[in-house]
Amino acid sequence: MSAKNPWFWLAAILAIALDRLTKVWVVAQLAPGESIALWPGVFHLTLVKNSGAAFSLFAGGSDWLKWISLLVSVGLCVYALVGPHLGSWEQMGFGLLLGGAVGNGFDRFAFGEVTDFLDFRLIQFPVFNGADIAINLGLACLLIGTLRSESRTPAPARPASKQIREPTDTTGG
């Protein structure tokens, strides 16, 4: 692990590992379209294959998405290696973004589609996966890092005020 931006690498490795492990497990347990109710009507594991982007946008004609995933992944690695030393929130944020991009990018290159399985039915949310969670957590970390750095930014210096001199006693007293 690089000594520079260590939280970046740790967050990326954990996100990639958790995404791969959960996808492999779900694919071994469920057939496409099959669902297991963990909390009936609220949260299910439902195996779906998504050839598009988030929420199945661009489904079917998304070959370019794998190249975007690769470009983003390479760009984030280069930034972590040759860019500035980042604060811990930024390191974790960019690392989680890398983990999500690699997780879904791997699926796109290996299978031509992304494995989704987390199904929140209570709010009718589109089915998603661990890489999607990593991307959203990464964005949240970057937002927190930005807000924290703004709150620590020192206020601009005030212009020097004119010195008021005390009157000197010229009466000798």
Swiss-Prot record:
UniProt feature, compositional bias: Basic and acidic residues: 163-173
Catalytic activity: Release of signal peptides from bacterial membrane prolipoproteins. Hydrolyzes -Xaa-Yaa-Zaa-|-(S,diacylglyceryl)Cys-, in which Xaa is hydrophobic (preferably Leu), and Yaa (Ala or Ser) and Zaa (Gly or Ala) have small, neutral side chains
Keywords: Aspartyl protease, Cell inner membrane, Cell membrane, Hydrolase, Membrane, Protease, Transmembrane, Transmembrane helix
UniProt-annotated catalytic positions: 116, 132
Cellular component terms (Gene Ontology): plasma membrane
Keyword Membrane: yes
InterPro entries: Peptidase_A8 (IPR001872)
Keyword Cell inner membrane: yes
Compartment(s) of residence: Cell inner membrane
Enzyme class: hydrolase
Pathway connected to this protein: Protein modification; lipoprotein biosynthesis (signal peptide cleavage)
A GO biological-process term: proteolysis
Region Disordered, residue ranges: 151-173
Record's protein name: Lipoprotein signal peptidase
Organism encoding this protein: Gloeobacter violaceus (strain ATCC 29082 / PCC 7421)
